[in-house]
Amino acid sequence: MLMRSDPFRELDRLTNQVLGTPTRPAVMPMDAWRVGRRLVVEFDLPGIDAESLDIDIERNVLTVRAERPALDPNREMLATERPRGVFSRELVLGDNLDTDKIEASYRDGVLSLHIPVDEKARPRKIAVGAARHPEPSPKTAREVVNA
């Protein structure tokens, strides 16, 4: 059996107990990928109530906020490893994404955002027409030659 060892975990735990603050910042892990004509972004937010999620877009900056409330201070905690408080993450979106059509869903602790590529930014073919010169009529050709 393999075990992952973190020599600082015990130090972090003791520091948190003594000072009452986490030594590492709360994170909002995410994955992002492109599927066809849309960008998919997923954030891991286990234990977050969907009502506490707040998603804003201003210009091309997408902000995701969530909150995991503090525990009852009267509890005698034996372990506190899950970060609490407000989490926030900002993503700068490219101009090629249609921010008016973002879809969001939250299921099993995962927030999923689907952001379509803007129609104007999609690759498209531009037809090139050949410039055609009118063929001279026999009369016109004789006039040109005689000139």
Curated annotation (Swiss-Prot):
Residues 21-131 form the sHSP domain. Pfam families: HSP20. Gene3D superfamilies: 2.60.40.790. PROSITE patterns: SHSP. Not known. This protein is one of the major immune reactive proteins in mycobacteria. Belongs to the small heat shock protein (HSP20) family. This is 18 kDa antigen 1.
